[in-house]
Amino acid sequence: MIHLDYQVAAEEVDEAELPTYEQCLKWVEVALLDDRLDGETELTIRIVDEDEIQTLNRDYRGKDQTTNVLSFPFENPPVLVDLGEELPYIGDLVICAQVVAQEAKAQHKPLEAHWAHMVIHGCLHLQGMDHVDDDEAIKMEALEAEILADLGYDSPYESD
């Protein structure tokens, strides 16, 4: 079972342009791949404005600019791992509403599809996937496209 803490902290956005809790939960469910996630799983999705995402991006990644999504994976303390009592929390996703909307418009993508992509992308990061080198990026993008296709969305990496 997935326990999703869904937070909307962005104040100057049209709530009609934000995904619902139910949509996010559906996207999270299909993006969780790891065998260890068979039981209870907890994560947070926090929708923020540009100021908050820029501050987090600067403080945690050294990049003083906005971004679409930040992933903060949770690592169980070694003492809990040793005891076999790992917590089900996998981490936090922080997604900037304005950046997602701007990207969807600029890339001529349906807003809902881009939100789905950002949630799935972030969930894959929480599970250890990355796109630092080309091989990792190819694998991650292919998996994102496959998951999105299963949900009925076009690949975010193919242009019309």
Curated annotation (Swiss-Prot):
| Similarity section | Belongs to the endoribonuclease YbeY family.
Tell me where in or outside the cell this protein is found: Cytoplasm
Name the chain's protein: Endoribonuclease YbeY
Keyword Amino-acid biosynthesis: yes or no?
A: no
Q: Name one GO cellular component term.
A: cytoplasm
Organism name: Hydrogenovibrio crunogenus (strain DSM 25203 / XCL-2) (Thiomicrospira crunogena)
Matching InterPro entries = MetalPrtase_cat_dom_sf_prd (IPR023091), YbeY (IPR002036), YbeY_CS (IPR020549)
Q: Name one GO molecular function term.
A: zinc ion binding
